[in-house]
Amino acid sequence: MAVNVYSTSVTSDNLSRHDMLAWINESLQLNLTKIEQLCSGAAYCQFMDMLFPGSIALKKVKFQAKLEHEYIQNFKILQAGFKRMGVDKIIPVDKLVKGKFQDNFEFVQWFKKFFDANYDGKEYDPVAARQGQETAVAPSLVAPALSKPKKPLGSSTAAPQRPIATQRTTAAPKAGPGMVRKNPGVGNGDDEAAELMQQVKVLKLTVEDLEKERDFYFGKLRNIELICQENEGENDPVLQRIVDILYATDEGFVIPDEGGPQEEQEEY
């Protein structure tokens, strides 16, 4: 069973973000560049496999996860490993999967202390354990949806406006008989770019609204799940029925890996 670590205070033993990334990359032979990339949960799953072989169904971990429901699936695998090894830590999944620096940095600081308290120094080949898989580069929850239009060169909404403005200012000083014919083309390009930018804004607002609605209901389901876990030893048939409904819903939602949720359902 695992040695639990409860201290969350900031001390001189805490690593900086750069040192933390160096430790993770060296230990797991990864190439993470940002703390935010830990939001996929894959690195934590492999660390658990390193600490407690067999505690994690590593073959089911999605190291190339790029979507939030894939992150959640990885954290469900991690939660199952925590439960199996008697780890008391509650994983703030709903916060971690957002990919925000502060939430992920706080959790990895705790995990580093947990790792140090449980690591026995045995040899471990991380690349062979994950069958050569590498983590996805810079996972983002919103950027992939916004980067689909091909005309804007950057992922942000402001970036495409700058070259457009440059085209206007450079065209004005060169106004003359040879250049007047090209102005309509530039104007059409501006109109097309403006229309694409408007579409991007609409899509972004739609995504944000859907994420808020999803997070609202996910938070409620997560709270219900925690209550059920806290009282799971009471053998209450009502609680068991609630748990069955919760995980049946998850199984139907996470379509990409039909085998994973069923096994985790038994572990919970």
Swiss-Prot record:
Intracellular or extracellular location(s): Cytoplasm, Cytoskeleton; Cytoplasm, Cytoskeleton, Microtubule organizing center, Centrosome; Cytoplasm, Cytoskeleton, Spindle; Cytoplasm, Cytoskeleton, Spindle pole
Superkingdom of this protein's organism: Eukaryota
Stretches the record annotates as Disordered: 146-180
PTM per Swiss-Prot/TrEMBL: Acetylation at Lys-220 by KAT2B/PCAF promotes dynamic kinetochore-microtubule interactions in early mitosis. Crotonylated by KAT5 during mitosis, promoting astral microtubule plasticity and dynamic connection between astral microtubules and the cortex during mitotic chromosome segregation, thereby ensuring accurate spindle positioning in mitosis. Decrotonylated by HDAC3.
Region (APC-binding): 220-242
Pfam families: CH (PF00307), EB1 (PF03271)
Sites of Phosphotyrosine modification: 124
Residues modified to N-acetylalanine: 2
Region Interaction with MTUS2/TIP150, residue ranges: 124-268
Chain positions with N6-acetyllysine modification: 220
Protein's job: Plus-end tracking protein (+TIP) that binds to the plus-end of microtubules and regulates the dynamics of the microtubule cytoskeleton. Recruits other +TIP proteins to microtubules by binding to a conserved Ser-X-Leu-Pro (SXLP) motif in their polypeptide chains. Promotes cytoplasmic microtubule nucleation and elongation. Involved in mitotic spindle positioning by stabilizing microtubules and promoting dynamic connection between astral microtubules and the cortex during mitotic chromosome segregation.
Name of the featured protein: Microtubule-associated protein RP/EB family member 1
Organism: Mus musculus (Mouse)
